[in-house]
Structure formats: structure tokens, C-alpha cells
Amino acid sequence: MIILPSITEVQVESVVFPPAVKPPGSDKTFFLGGAGVRGLEIEGKFIKFTAIGVYLENDAVTSLAAKWKGKTAEEVADSGDFFAEIVTGPFEKFTKVTTILPLTGQQYSEKVVENCVAYWKAIGKFTDAEDEATKKFLQVFKNEMFHPGASILFTQSPQGSLTISFSKDGSIPEKENAIIENKQLSEAVLESIIGKKGVSPSAKQSLAARLSDLLKQCESTT
């Protein structure tokens, strides 16, 4: 088992992402890879909707080190392959999306599905299975309301499951709300955040800076 150097928390607006969390239904503790804001330019003003933290299980460090050890933050930030490897790598990921402005479950889920479908069509992988998975995804969110400080939690398994949980106060619940078995959806949700057209460039920058530094620290301790 790899022993990680000291991992720090990240604050995004008023939201603090702790250095380590244990996802709902998991016996593993994940470390904070990076965090950032998701917003949109509306009438010349940048409106912030959510703060997003991306956590990884410890095995991610060993997996990423093979190709990215010794690379600078700028080198990994500019590489689409780096983020693709986080999305598709053989390790678990946990994403915490905390609302800054109120959002309905329908608003949030429809936008996520729109981004996922656009990604699948771009890579030629939109099948009936993905269509069915998005319908399940929309159903899970249908009656939810996320007030400021509430969180949407995703656990992405390399085996292909997407675990969805909700928290009204930003804490980590013990149990999940739903599990959807579809590898393409599991990966596409994270891809929509940190991928080529990801909705949170600041989370990508944070991941690049923190992980490149972490890989350097791990290299110096081995």
C-alpha cells in the first residue's frame, strides 16, 4: 500500500473540501485530487453554481505515476491524456458537487445528461444501453431540490457502476441513493467535469497542480 504525503484541504468559495473522505457504502478512504468552481458567463458576469471536489483512491497515484511522474503542473494541465487517464483509470473516483446557488434535480440532471450524450456522440459510443442509463439517471434526480450547501455525490467504479448519493448539508451520508450499472455513464459524468470540454476548468487546474506535486513527493520518498 502506498503511503501518501500530507494532503491539504481546498476551499472553493465558502465550501471546504477536506483532504480525505470515505464515500457512502465504501470502506476505503479517498484523497482530494483537486477542486474548483463550475459557473457560466451570464450577461458579462461570471455566475458560480457549484463547487466540485474530485477524490481518488490511493491506487491512483501508482497508476498515474507510470506515465506522469516528473511532469510539471503545466505539462499535465495541457494534456488531455492526463485527464482521460483519471476518468478511465483502473481505480475508484469520488466526486462531490456542492451547490452555491439553488438547483433543482431536474435542472442539474438534464444538463449532465446533455453533456454526456454530446460526449458519447463525439466518440461514437451512444447505444441503447447508454440511453437507458440516462433515463435512470434523470429519474434518480427527478424530485430532488438542492439548496446552497447541499451536495450531489458520485462514486465511479472502474468495474462500471455509478453510485449516486445526496446530502442536504454537505456531509457524507452512510448510504447511497442509487446505483446505475453502466461504465460509459460512470466515466462520462466525470468526463463532463474534467474532460476536454469539462465544465470546471478550475478543478482541472487544481487536479493538475496537486497531482503533479504529489507524484513528485512520492518519487522523492521511494
UniProtKB/Swiss-Prot annotation:
Tell me the pathway. Secondary metabolite biosynthesis; flavonoid biosynthesis
Q: Name one GO molecular function term.
A: chalcone isomerase activity
Query: Record-annotated residues binding substrate?
Result: 50, 115, 192
Which reactions are catalysed by this chain? a chalcone = a flavanone
* UniProt cross-references to Pfam families, sorted A to Z: Chalcone (PF02431)
Q: Keywords of this protein's UniProt record, alphabetized? A: Flavonoid biosynthesis, Isomerase
Quote the EC number: 5.5.1.6
Q: Which SUPFAM superfamilies match?
A: Chalcone isomerase
Query: For the site Important for catalytic activity, which positions are given?
Result: 108
The protein's matches in InterPro entries, at most eight in alphabetical order, are given as:
CFI, Chalcone_isomerase, Chalcone_isomerase_3-sand, Chalcone_isomerase_bundle_sf, Chalcone_isomerase_sf
Its UniProt miscellaneous note says:
Part of the biosynthetic pathway for all classes of flavonoids, a large class of secondary plant metabolites, many of which are brightly colored.
Q: What does this protein do?
A: Catalyzes the intramolecular cyclization of bicyclic chalcones into tricyclic (S)-flavanones. Responsible for the isomerization of 4,2',4',6'-tetrahydroxychalcone (also termed chalcone) into naringenin.
Instruction: Provide the family line.
Output: Belongs to the chalcone isomerase family.
The family database entries (PANTHER family) matched by this protein are listed as: CHALCONE--FLAVANONE ISOMERASE 1-RELATED, CHALCONE--FLAVONONE ISOMERASE 1-RELATED
The protein's name is Chalcone--flavanone isomerase
Q: Which organism is it from?
A: Verbena hybrida (Garden vervain)
- Supply the gene name: CHI
